[in-house]
A protein has these predicted regions:
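C-terminal regulatory/interaction module of P-loop NTP-utilizing enzymes
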Residues: 1-153
Length: 153
């Protein structure tokens, strides 16, 4: 709500108030683009003042490409397994679907723990899911058995 009020001030008055500095007015009308993956609802007031665009999760091929560029030391086959797992996790009935940042964090954790294959150690696999699952409810939904199934798909 505080962030939304901040955005409304910028979009309505073309200025921003910063307690330490005062009010800063735009010299020209700003162009503001807001992207979303539906992690929060935006008010009608905010939607009226901007172009609102939904950003879909990347397709498997693009996510794999991003993973390989950001973490080039991870084996290609393990990278494929990681991306497949995350893509399959996103279709599960969870509140907070993991984004690219979570995929990268999880891949780094998996690699850092020395896993060469997601099926190497399901206990370690499940313990690292905290990188992907951000709510207690989601952690309850993705049991060790479900994680194991997702790793095999």
């Amino acid at each position: 709500e505080e962030f939304e009020a901040y955005l409304l001030e910028i979009l309505s008055e073309y200025q921003v108030s910063i307690p330490e500095y005062g009010t800063i007015k735009a010299l020209s009308k700003p162009i503001v683009i807001i992207t979303s993956n539906n992690t929060r609802d935006l008010s009608d007031a905010l939607r009226r003042r901007c172009i609102y665009n939904y950003v879909y999760y990347p397709k498997k091929e693009l996510e794999l490409e991003i993973l390989q560029k950001k973490l080039p030391n991870i084996d290609l086959e393990l990278s494929r397994q990681i991306v497949n797992f995350v893509q399959n996790l996103r279709v599960q009935d969870i509140e907070k679907k993991p984004g690219i940042a979570e995929t990268l964090d999880w891949a780094a954790a998996i690699s850092g723990l020395g896993l060469k294959d997601l099926s190497d150690n399901y206990k370690v696999l499940h313990s690292t899911l905290v990188c992907l699952l951000k709510t207690e409810a989601d952690k309850a939904v993705i049991s060790p058995e479900i994680a194991q199934k997702l790793a095999k798909i």
